[in-house]
Amino acid sequence: MKKVTAMLFSMAVGLNAVSMAAKAKASEEQETDVLLIGGGIMSATLGTYLRELEPEWSMTMVERLEGVAQESSNGWNNAGTGHSALMELNYTPQNADGSISIEKAVAINEAFQISRQFWAHQVERGVLRTPRSFINTVPHMSFVWGEDNVNFLRARYAALQQSSLFRGMRYSEDHAQIKEWAPLVMEGRDPQQKVAATRTEIGTDVNYGEITRQLIASLQKKSNFSLQLSSEVRALKRNDDNTWTVTVADLKNGTAQNIRAKFVFIGAGGAALKLLQESGIPEAKDYAGFPVGGQFLVSENPDVVNHHLAKVYGKASVGAPPMSVPHIDTRVLDGKRVVLFGPFATFSTKFLKNGSLWDLMSSTTTSNVMPMMHVGLDNFDLVKYLVSQVMLSEEDRFEALKEYYPQAKKEDWRLWQAGQRVQIIKRDAEKGGVLRLGTEVVSDQQGTIAALLGASPGASTAAPIMLDLLEKVFGDRVSSPQWQATLKAIVPSYGRKLNGDVAATERELQYTSEVLGLKYDKPQAADSTPKPQLKPQPVQKEVADIAL
């Protein structure tokens, strides 16, 4: 035990010495208006907004890896779903009286419409090129079995017809119809099994890594933008004039430099929490993080791939977190179609796929250790789920696949380790600590530094999330006529809700579909699927939304 303690102490001292050495060597200082930490889709999106809003502002982006979009934004490290709640059942929880709540589904869909408009605008500007390289039409389906689940899906479908955003969704309990929609899912299935499915033709598969690379490539064309790769942030210090001095180490030659920035955005994915803590702002003390990874089964066999064109999402088991929702998806990656099934949760103390095993420990402080303990005690179902996932065997994963693909063959599939997600834990006056759903922008009172924490729905809502950040940090500028006009040019529906306005919804979907090369047929009137007799349900507490 003494040897272990001594080893840990020496490692801590060594890491601190490296950090101090980097600070000492950082003699030259670079000045920039905006410093973007992290080369993922969030930094790329914010940089693209600011390039249009304030083209004269200088920007510097630093990324610790040798290329951009290599962590969570990488197409192989996420599910590639254009999350719009067309099929994700966790966005429509069932209330105690049996009714279906659609508020979150509407909000998620509204957010994705902003992303579609943002991307379409960038295509028109020539910033994004060849839309098929990053977004493709892939129908979105929900699929369930068993009487209770069928009743739930029928009720969900009926509830969503209240929203203009979900017009065009179809519902069926007919085996033949569902087989036509998703043959791979139905072939070999018990013909007596009670099943149901919904299908929306305008679903999408998105390669967020490709979007990120193209956005950053466009930013690099301007002389007042600098991209520094293999560059790791080692220290952040607020100056007396409310600017920030950020020490950045070059991981290739061991040198370091100071970057003086008027505004700092920490868009470093799983590393954002530690950097936010390093900044020393009081707001950082309220947060902790818990990492969860994911694995997928992948098939590139043409016999499988050519037999499936849909993203098919199931229903999580009672008490399990939404990230446990199984889905079998058509993906377009590296220019070719593949099929993925999962996710299967994994556990590592790393906050990034290319992170350190010390990430969890080094982010635990006297301020956030108690909230973390409270969350662990209050979310035993989540803990139990993670333990069960870690214990899964190869056979267990294959049996899970066969529930969605009855005729699956082991030799057609391989296991792939996707990215890490860090779930937000926030201090709470009543409960001590709570799991926060979705993502959260954390900034200082002066609006000089901001970080994005959280994971889901993540990249698919990068455009609206960065809009929220602009409003939070640059509120005075956002309200100016100049910024208002520019933002409405980028996002035509900015400041308005599409939900409830059929004409506006159809207009924006038609516009973005034409520009992005996506399928869109004006939806017909909703069918007359009968509403089910709703059964009262036990009240279920909200669980962590950490879907991949």
From Swiss-Prot:
Oxidoreductase keyword on record: yes
Any GO BP annotation: tricarboxylic acid cycle
The reaction(s) this protein catalyses: (S)-malate + a quinone = a quinol + oxaloacetate
Co-factor requirement: FAD
Region annotation Disordered: where it falls in the sequence: 521-548
InterPro entries: FAD/NAD-bd_sf, MQO
Compositional bias of kind Low complexity: 530-541
Gene3D superfamilies in the cross-refs: D-Amino Acid Oxidase, subunit A, domain 2 (3.30.9.10), FAD/NAD(P)-binding domain (3.50.50.60)
Pfam families attached to this UniProt entry: Mqo (PF06039)
A GO molecular-function descriptor: L-malate dehydrogenase (quinone) activity
Enzyme Commission designation: 1.1.5.4
Keywords assigned: FAD, Flavoprotein, Oxidoreductase, Tricarboxylic acid cycle
Recorded metabolic or biological pathway in which this protein acts: Carbohydrate metabolism; tricarboxylic acid cycle; oxaloacetate from (S)-malate (quinone route): step 1/1
Enzyme class: oxidoreductase
Ranges annotated as spanning the membrane: none
PANTHER family xref list: L-2-HYDROXYGLUTARATE DEHYDROGENASE, MITOCHONDRIAL
Family label: Belongs to the MQO family.
Full protein name: Probable malate:quinone oxidoreductase
